[in-house]
Amino acid sequence: MDTSILAVTTNPKGKNYALAVCWLLGVGCLLAWNSMLTIVDYYAYLFPWYHPSRILTIIYQSFSIGALSVLVHKEARLNTRRRNLFGYSLFSLGSLAVLVLNLATSGRGGIGSFIGVCVISAAFGLADAHVYGGMIGDLSMMTPEFLQSFLAGLAASGALTSGLRLVIKAAFKNSRDGLRKGATLFFAMSASFELVCVLLYAYVFPRIPVVKYYRAKAIIQGSRTVWADLAAGGIQVQPITQDEEALRYDHRLNKGDLMLLYSDLAVTLFLVYLLTFSIFPGFLSEDTGKYSLGDWYALVLIAVFNVSDLVGRYVPMVKKLKMKSRKCLLITSLGRLLLIPAFNITGIYGSQGWMIFLMSVLGLSNGYLTVCVITSAPYDLLAPEQNALGNLLVLYICGGMFAGVACDWLWLVGKDW
């Protein structure tokens, strides 16, 4: 065994530093898309006949699940460093493209502008497939705490964008020019932050001692995905031969084995995101009725969901509050389906207070169950198996999102559209 690997596996320092970087990388994974979702009132103003909240979401999810399916199939041989850097770079370039499009068209609507926004939404979906699966797979080979921090960062991006959107809306007022200025500021900040994430992942994260420690362990256990990241941290590793690879592979669980063993976790995540995305964001933007909050109403509901989602992802940090039974997690995810008639009835007969309450339940349960399921995946697997399982679970999350977005259109049945 390489002596440099032996050295690094005895020096796991910098855990808190790594947790902070994981959180920031989690924010970057969804910041660009959450920025697009959060300014949905601006797109509804520009493109009132195109159902932008629904169209953009289904385009995003279609490209995300399509690309992720290919990446999951090839995950064992992919260069994780190249995969994640490509994703964060595409997020940054996509955010910059929204900014340029907004400035070039001077905030005018029309089919040309809408097609441009749709193309950028597709690019965000492609970037998400690279980063989300890549990061979850990578962190699955480390520790549940890193996963929890990354997942909390995902939710924090939504909470941050929602809070900023409310401030911008109040500052720029509800005029076309004000909405446009707010959108411009949003994506300027998004493009900058995504560039920071590129730098963090490229030059900071691989040099943290505890990260090198876990990646060195992964190499010892036969992982081929982290060589470039370990090299970026200053540890050079000789590639294993094909004969060694075949010998190690014979003793591993393949993707089919993993899915049979952990199908309950995959189904739970699918159901969680099926329910969430059948309501969020399309139903919130178009089908919740009109109340005293006026055009602030959809933004407030989105903010409530995002903040509740963030809180839910920290609840499992209290060990007594973390649900560990896989059967209970599955039953709870099935129970959430009762929220569909609850939202429907409240949208017709209820007050805005009840709608806000239901939205907080939706967000809190979404965040809580996500962290409980992903961090409950076993850590006695070999590193390549953990990476494969992490990617598979993300695929089921994206599958649930896509199915939910498709079901979201059912809210329009019987309406004049």
Swiss-Prot record:
| Gene Ontology CC annotations of this record | plasma membrane
Q: Which cysteines are joined by disulfide bonds?
A: none
First-listed, main subcellular location of the protein, grouped into a coarse class: membrane
Presence of the UniProt keyword Cytoplasm in the record:
no
- Kindly give the membrane topology term recorded for this protein: Multi-pass membrane protein
Which positions, given as ranges, span the membrane? Answer: 20-40, 52-72, 85-105, 109-129, 144-164, 185-205, 265-285, 292-312, 328-348, 354-374, 393-413
Coiled-coil regions in this chain? none
Keywords for this protein? Cell membrane, Membrane, Transmembrane, Transmembrane helix, Transport
Q: In which tissues is it expressed?
A: Expressed in leaves and flowers.
Q: Does the keyword Acyltransferase apply?
A: no
- GO MF term (any one): nucleoside transmembrane transporter activity
Places the protein is found: Cell membrane
Q: What is one Pfam family matched by this protein?
A: Nucleoside_tran
Q: Which InterPro entries match?
A: Eqnu_transpt, MFS_trans_sf
Q: Which family does it belong to?
A: Belongs to the SLC29A/ENT transporter (TC 2.A.57) family.
Q: What does this protein do?
A: May be involved in nucleoside transport.
Can you say what this protein is called?
Equilibrative nucleotide transporter 2
Q: What is the lineage of its organism?
A: Eukaryota, Viridiplantae, Streptophyta, Embryophyta, Tracheophyta
